[in-house]
Amino acid sequence: MAKNVRFSINMFGVMSPMIPPPRHHPVAPMSYPYQKPSSFEYDQLNRVPLSPHHHQQPPYPKPPLQHPSASPIHHQPPPPQHSPSVGDFLPPLQPQPHQDAAGGSRSIYSAHALSQAATNLHPQHLQHLQHGPFSQQPPPPPMGSSPSPALSSSITTGGGGVTRGGGGGGHIIPVDDDSGCALEEYTWVPPGLRPDQVHLYFSAIPEDKVPYVNSIGERHRVRQLLQQLPPHDNEVRYCHSLTDEERKELKLFSAQRKREALGRGTVKQLATNQICDGCGECISSGDMGVYASRFDPGTCWHPACFVCSVCKELLVDLIYFHREARLYCGRHHAETLKPRCSACDEIILADECTEAEGRAWHIKHFACFECDKQLGGQRYIMRDGKPYCLHCFDAMFAEYCDFCSEPIGVDQGQMSHDGQHWHATDSCFACSTCRCSLLGRPFLPRRGEIYCSIACSKGEPPTPSDGSVPTVLPSRTRLRAPGQRNFDDPSAEYVPNLPKSPEPLQSPISERSTPHSSPAKHSHTEMSTNISSPVPTEFNDQTYSVSADNDVQTYTGSGATSPISSRTLPCTEPSDQTDHQHQSLPPLLPNHRRIPQCSPELDRLLHKDRSRQPLDLTDLSLSLDNWQADHNSTVIPGPSIAKTNPALTSSMPELSQSLQQQQQQQQQPQSLLAYDDISPLDKASAITDPDDAIQNASDDASHSIVELPTPPPIVSNTRDPENLPKMPLRRFQNSLPRNKFHKSSIIKKEVRFEGIFQDSLPRSKSYCTRSGGSRSRSSKSKRRSSHHHQHHRSSGESSSYSGTSYDRHHHSSSGSSSSNRRSPRRRRVPDVEFIEHQDHHRGDGDDDSDSRSVCSTCSSSSSSADDTVYELPMRRTYGGTRIHYMPNNSLACARKRKQLQNSHPYEKDNKNCIIS
């Protein structure tokens, strides 16, 4: 052990050991930004009695150290010269910026003023130390690297037994390297404890708060000293910009606190069980407990429960403040008495202050955190606990609108969703497709955009929610809203602008609805009864297709999305029936309620359409030119004809003619010709201009299939041949005037034809105006035209129309027939009911009668060789755009086989069918 000690002879001839300079353990750099004074400086300046072994430093130089063998290992220091004042417990630490709950506020003076105060602190300490016992020693080591003098008597060097003493010089302590001392591990220990009691005490507190040397707990202790015991709460020299009155106030405030509230806890090992005042749990005997002299003698805490009642942090070095039977750290105890400035972290001693956001500021300190502009009486915005003026806030934190890319100011409304921001205006916060405002409405965010509906998110036009809203169609399709028409005014003209579509429609009601028949001899009351047939229930199940510019959009006529359902066949009121019984026609009945009886010829045509047999368009013997002329003619009022708009006439205006035929029969009773005595060509010639109206209206329907005036309820029963009325067609034809179907006589009805012949019908031309390919196919129809003229002459009938218009009608019919060959609709085969209908006519004794003269084979071709051309292959059922009800393969194949089986008995007759 002597090898570690050197001896020297001083000027008095006395040999004394040479004490080497103190060796210190290396300390890791501290993360705390402020320089902390060493524990040595705390003890030398403030005389904090950290332990019973603490040595008071005398103001005079000590005599030379004695030999280690002559000096005791533990030297007991004399008692303190004076009783420790409250100020002795408050080390003059440097100020720490106030850290609020957000952790972001800072002192506006910490950058310059506090650093200047720190530089003024250490020269004073060094000057004081020059007269101390270690005047010949080097200056104190860097802060944070020196252990506490309370532990100086027991801290050993790494390799020997020489230590430095806290008060009486160094002590040579023979310590085995493996044994270790309990107190050498800590930078601070509670006073008055044995080593085993120190270990027991620190085992009761969290590990990260135990002040081991060079540990996280040591750095935590230093931070808590600055946080819990702010120096500017006690010393005037650490404050800034105080007036003389405020300086006096601070001294009085600090002295009062120390006198009335300051104390230090005492750690003892309990002899009996105690109840912790903090948690209420029992402290067992033998455990360590903390007592406070300013509380009742029996009050005790667990070491981990001796915390501040506000911040819940362990009271650093057991220094506490008492108020109303509660424990406080120095910071929060001062705040219970006076407010603290959120900017400079100092106690506000002035009479006035600014309070905002639940905190207080000096009046001059409540300023913008960025530009230091005072905000007293001004608008400001708090962000992260810091006030900003509006200009600085916009420059630093303003969001940008996703629509216009302009910044959203603090004075402007803002809409935010999922990290996106918009101006709260109708132009910015709007649907990305239709640009309708979404303010105050639910919206659909998708792919970074916002939409008002699912349709808009898919790029489609919005769908109306009910039938009263006009349907939004493509730009070239212009329709008038259904609500714009006055149904109660029969003279009101309503001309919808129906755009063209290349697909004609066939009404599904012709296949689905229950037919109603009424003979021609029935009265008008019976006809009105048939008007209110329950067709709307079936009509609501249909589907309407909107087609414009090859874009097909389908609406279901259920009353929710289709505008057509808003005027679908309301039932006829009884007043309408009784008011019009005395009239020959019911013209004053509103157009949407008027459903006349059908003629037998129309019954047969519609029956063939329902039975999926090709419709005989060749028998429609009128020209479109005549219909167009009548369509544009002036209104000629008649005694029993209502003034209606021809635009309200549907695709089958011959329905209105059949009413007039029946009324002519009732008003002019003459000798009737038998129905079977009239050839089908006579019947076809008896159907005048409305036949061409069928062609033109079907062409119009092929171009506009959205909104037609009325739905097509079918009230005829063509499946009961016994109820077929006997009509004086020949006399009625001769008695009809040329201008019969003028503007005031056409009754609003419609029949829709279904078929897909986009490739054969032009988009903007009617049949009668086509040229080129259509005329090249007219030779066969012209030859048939001559046969029809001969048949008319042999039957003794005279046609009311010139041969030119007659040929032109067949020219258009030929074009229709040729186009119908390519239509998938022509794959539909006749059903059983239509075959039974033909068998019934044959059973009457007229095998070569009119019922087979208008068969599907003769209507389109004169030989059975064209049947294969007429019936397309089965697999092409799915070609093109399908509208309404298309048969699937199984139904189509079944009907195909049934047609082939039923067509053999008539194949020979069909081949030998000659028109003369």
Swiss-Prot record:
Chain positions covered by the region annotation Disordered: 49-105, 127-176, 460-593, 635-671, 692-725, 763-870
Gene3D superfamilies assigned to the protein according to its UniProt record, in alphabetical order: Cysteine Rich Protein (2.10.110.10)
InterPro entries to which the protein is assigned, alphabetical: LIM1_prickle (IPR033725), LIM2_prickle (IPR033726), LIM3_prickle (IPR033727), PET_domain (IPR010442), PET_prickle (IPR033723), Pk/Esn/Tes (IPR047120), Znf_LIM (IPR001781)
Comp. bias regions, Basic and acidic residues: 829-844
Residue ranges constituting the LIM zinc-binding domain according to the UniProt record: 274-338, 339-399, 400-462
One Gene Ontology CC term in the entry: plasma membrane
Composition bias, Low complexity: 145-156, 655-671, 796-805, 852-867
Alphabetical UniProt keywords: Cell membrane, Developmental protein, LIM domain, Membrane, Metal-binding, Repeat, Zinc
Superkingdom of the organism of origin: Eukaryota
Membrane topology: Peripheral membrane protein
Biased composition regions of type Basic residues, renumbered to the chain: 777-793
Pfam families registered for this protein in UniProt: LIM, PET
Subcellular location: Cell membrane
Residue spans of biased composition, Polar residues class: 507-517, 526-569, 642-654
One Gene Ontology term from the biological process aspect of the record: establishment of tissue polarity
GO molecular function, one term: zinc ion binding
Entry keyword Ribonucleoprotein: no
Residues covered by the PET domain: 167-275
Subunit structure: Interacts with dsh; PET and LIM domains interact with dsh DEP domain, in wing cells. Interacts with Vang in photoreceptor cells.
Protein name as it appears in the record: Protein prickle
Species name: Aedes aegypti (Yellowfever mosquito)
Phylogenetic lineage: Eukaryota, Metazoa, Ecdysozoa, Arthropoda, Hexapoda
